[in-house]
């Protein structure tokens, strides 16, 4: 019965997803021996760094290639016009670039099922007057050419004929957001998810008017001769939706960035410049098989990198260790930065090793940090509670929902270890994830800057502009 219903849904989606009205071009059959995915650079789309590849679209593309049982080839482009042209010419099989569904795209391409939703927001800088209306702007709007933002402005212009804007072809959304923060332009339009991610590094960004709400982010397929690929994509999407993959990736890339503290973010960026250099070598030395930046992020959350930090509850030092924990791991002086960092790393590593093997490697750190905060026993209580509620005890996205319940008598009276401040643990882990993301960004920026200084400026690549800061150069489109 389930298969029958899915077949009906699949057929409906294939025929009703959209009607594409484009000119027929000569079609050269392409046997799918690899999945060629056209994309753009961006932290939520596709990035490459020393830690490997990442991005919501990239992670989904990896899974789709595995589903099709073919190798994946990511092909990044520098602008949307080239990307669209490549798809129409059959140089790529699909576009996965964080693009929203729009009428113009629906007319030109076939649109895949929704991955997540975003709002389109007007972005301005801290200190500027808050716009009350699109006509109440004290400056000019700058947007990316061929973007969905141009479509939005074009529609708004019909109601507000005096509305004007600039379009750029040699910048991406990340660069425009940086230009807002650096006072180089007045306004831009961006997806809400992009603003949430980038304000961790650019805290002066502000979201103003919501111009479009709840837009689906989708993949684009060729307008013709793509029935088979669309059918496979829909079946894959259905499978991953049921498996919770979309929820997992949504939490992975966006779940921890929704909270934002302007003052804290600015203070953290200052601390990276002024305080971290004194202790970075200690974090790198004692991290061992851990990412030193996760260790440093944990330390900042604990003590703001203050080796003399103390709390009324008796925890002390850079890693805010309790006396029993320090004794257990052989630390004699908790106020010594070197000992505290060494002890914190050892304790965190022990938390990771104690976790059940059923917890995926990519999520073990978040479970371990929750254990570091409220204790391993309470995390195990939460996992058992999740299981009883038919949630996944091995998925951080589900544990985040359950941990706050440990503060409610209805739930904690059924657990072995009782009450715990579970909501505090969720906030604790989310904060560390934000600090970690910022450290990775700053570290990559520094490496890119050092690399640029080492290379002669007249040896520019003929392939076009370099990747965004913090990325390595994967295959360029031929």
UniProtKB/Swiss-Prot annotation:
Extent of Acidic residues compositional bias: 451-461
Where are the annotated segments for LT domain?
258-478
| Keyword annotations of the record | Cell outer membrane, Cell wall biogenesis/degradation, Lyase, Membrane, Signal
> Region (Non-LT domain): which ranges?
23-257
According to its record, how does it sit in the membrane?
Peripheral membrane protein
Q: Which is one GO molecular function term here?
A: peptidoglycan lytic transglycosylase activity
Listed PROSITE patterns: PROKAR_LIPOPROTEIN (PS51257)
Task: Spell out the reaction equation it catalyses.
Answer: Exolytic cleavage of the (1->4)-beta-glycosidic linkage between N-acetylmuramic acid (MurNAc) and N-acetylglucosamine (GlcNAc) residues in peptidoglycan, from either the reducing or the non-reducing ends of the peptidoglycan chains, with concomitant formation of a 1,6-anhydrobond in the MurNAc residue
Predominantly, its location class is membrane
Signal sequence, renumbered to the chain: 1-22
**Where is it located?**
Cell outer membrane
Give the protein's biological function.
Murein-degrading enzyme that degrades murein glycan strands and insoluble, high-molecular weight murein sacculi, with the concomitant formation of a 1,6-anhydromuramoyl product. Lytic transglycosylases (LTs) play an integral role in the metabolism of the peptidoglycan (PG) sacculus. Their lytic action creates space within the PG sacculus to allow for its expansion as well as for the insertion of various structures such as secretion systems and flagella.
The molecule here is called Membrane-bound lytic murein transglycosylase F
Organism of provenance: Shewanella sp. (strain MR-7)
């Amino acid at each position: 019965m389930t298969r029958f219903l899915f077949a009906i849904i699949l057929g409906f989606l294939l025929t009703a997803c959209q009607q594409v009205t484009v000119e027929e071009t000569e079609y050269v059959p392409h046997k799918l021996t690899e999945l060629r995915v056209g994309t753009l650079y961006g932290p939520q789309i596709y990035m490459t760094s020393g830690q490997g590849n990442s991005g919501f679209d990239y992670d989904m593309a990896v899974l789709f290639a595995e589903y099709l049982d073919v190798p994946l080839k990511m092909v990044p482009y520098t602008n949307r016009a080239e990307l669209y042209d490549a798809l129409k010419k059959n140089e790529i099989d699909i576009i996965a670039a964080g693009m929203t569904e729009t009428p113009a795209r629906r007319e030109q391409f076939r649109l895949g099922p929704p991955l997540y939703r975003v709002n389109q927001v007007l972005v301005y800088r801290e200190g500027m007057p808050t716009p009350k209306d699109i006509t109440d702007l004290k400056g000019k709007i700058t947007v990316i050419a061929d973007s969905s933002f141009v479509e939005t402005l074009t529609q708004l212009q019909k109601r507000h004929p005096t509305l004007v804007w600039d379009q750029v072809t040699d910048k991406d959304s990340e660069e425009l957001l940086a230009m807002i923060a650096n006072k180089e332009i007045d306004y831009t339009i961006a997806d809400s998810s992009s603003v949430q991610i980038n304000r961790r590094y650019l805290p002066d960004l502000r979201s103003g008017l919501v111009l479009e709400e709840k837009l689906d982010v989708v993949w684009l397929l060729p307008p013709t001769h793509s029935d088979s690929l669309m059918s496979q994509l829909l079946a894959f999407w259905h499978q991953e939706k049921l498996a919770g993959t979309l929820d997992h990736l949504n939490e992975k890339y966006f779940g921890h960035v929704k909270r934002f503290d302007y003052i804290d973010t600015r203070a953290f960026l200052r601390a990276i410049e002024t305080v971290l250099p004194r202790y970075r070598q200690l974090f790198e030395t004692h991290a061992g098989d851990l990412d030193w930046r996760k260790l440093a992020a944990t330390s900042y959350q604990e003590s703001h990198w203050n080796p003399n930090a103390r709390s009324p509850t008796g925890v002390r030092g850079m890693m805010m260790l309790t006396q029993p924990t320090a004794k257990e791991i052989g630390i004699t002086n908790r106020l010594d930065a070197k000992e505290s960092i060494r002890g914190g790393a050892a304790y965190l590593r022990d938390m990771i090793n104690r976790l059940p093997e059923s917890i995926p490697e990519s999520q073990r750190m978040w479970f371990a940090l929750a254990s570091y905060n409220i204790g391993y026993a309470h995390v195990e209580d939460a996992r058992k509670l999740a299981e009883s509620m038919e949630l996944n005890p091995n998925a951080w996205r589900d544990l985040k929902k359950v941990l706050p319940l440990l503060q409610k008598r209805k739930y904690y009276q059924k657990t072995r270890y009782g009450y715990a401040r579970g909501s505090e643990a969720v906030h604790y882990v989310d904060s560390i994830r934000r600090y970690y993301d910022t450290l990775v960004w700053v570290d990559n920026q520094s490496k890119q800057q050092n690399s640029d200084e080492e290379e002669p400026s007249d040896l520019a690549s003929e392939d076009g502009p370099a990747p965004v800061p913090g990325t390595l150069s994967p295959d360029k489109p031929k």
